[in-house]
Amino acid sequence: MARNTLSSRFRRVDIDEFDENKFVDEQEEAAAAAGEPGPDPSEVDGLLRQGDMLRAFHAALRNSPVNTKNQAVKERAQGVVLKVLTNFKSSEIEQAVQSLDRNGIDLLMKYIYKGFEKPTENSSAVLLQWHEKALAVGGLGSIIRVLTARKTV
């Protein structure tokens, strides 16, 4: 019995490791390990400079940060998508919207409504054009799915 009380193995445990005030979100760790979520701004800018609007549009919607809680990442992705949407000609919008599936249209609608929350110069008029075309393709169901969704962009 005296042998167990003199043991010093308990001193090897770092109790600060188990501090409840040191909370780290598992989703943020997974996102950091997987790389930066959201669209790649350099890829999208390169496609915009080349004039390939449709590929830039799909690249901007790819890897959207829906599951992350980091607002800076979401704001950066919103800026990239808004840049692509404002660079489109109004005659090309319908073709771009029709190239999306149902989930893509819902994601586009999320970005449109997010853009309505924080309007910039001339963005509201462009977003209204996109909203009109997305509503024509996606129907009222896309609006309902966006407004009731828990995961935001």
Curated annotation (Swiss-Prot):
Gene Ontology BP terms: Arp2/3 complex-mediated actin nucleation; cell migration; regulation of actin filament polymerization
Keyword vocabulary terms for this entry: Actin-binding, Cell projection, Cytoplasm, Cytoskeleton, Phosphoprotein
Name of the protein in its database record: Actin-related protein 2/3 complex subunit 5-like protein
Cellular component terms per the entry's GO annotation: Arp2/3 protein complex; cell projection; cytoplasm; glutamatergic synapse
Modification Phosphoserine, positions: 64
Function description: May function as component of the Arp2/3 complex which is involved in regulation of actin polymerization and together with an activating nucleation-promoting factor (NPF) mediates the formation of branched actin networks.
Main location (coarse class): cytoplasm
InterPro entries linked to this entry: ARPC5 (IPR006789), ARPC5_sf (IPR036743)
Coiled-coil residues: none
Molecular function via GO: actin filament binding
SUPFAM superfamilies assigned: Arp2/3 complex 16 kDa subunit ARPC5
